[in-house]
Curated annotation (Swiss-Prot):
Compositional bias segments (type: Basic residues): 100-121
Keyword set includes Protease: no
Stretches for region Disordered: 97-121
Protein name from the UniProt record: Small ribosomal subunit protein uS13
Amino acid sequence: MARISGIDIPREKRVEVALTYIYGIGLTRAQAILEKSGVNPDIRVKDLDDGDIQKLRAVTEEFTLEGDLRRQEGMALKRLQDIGCVRGRRHRMSLPVRGQRTRTNARTRRGARKTVAGRKK
């Protein structure tokens, strides 16, 4: 199994798709990596030789991927929360951050409904 950026990429898939299993690499970036390294995107991972894998590793080293990228994103959110800006407070309260309405239609972010009983008369 080919190991790139600390991730075992699936052997049976095309290289173009297999690279997307690495956090931080989508289809567009995978295509750019393959073009830059000169590896054919249509071959399967199991058919790659060691030279191709080395080329892919060398090109992916240029990007922030996996743990470093997760840490970077976490630090950005923590910074927003620490400075107390609106976005940081919304993240802390698990509410929509980008101005969406919350009276209705915020179920994904707010979680399941918590039913409140009506007042007895």
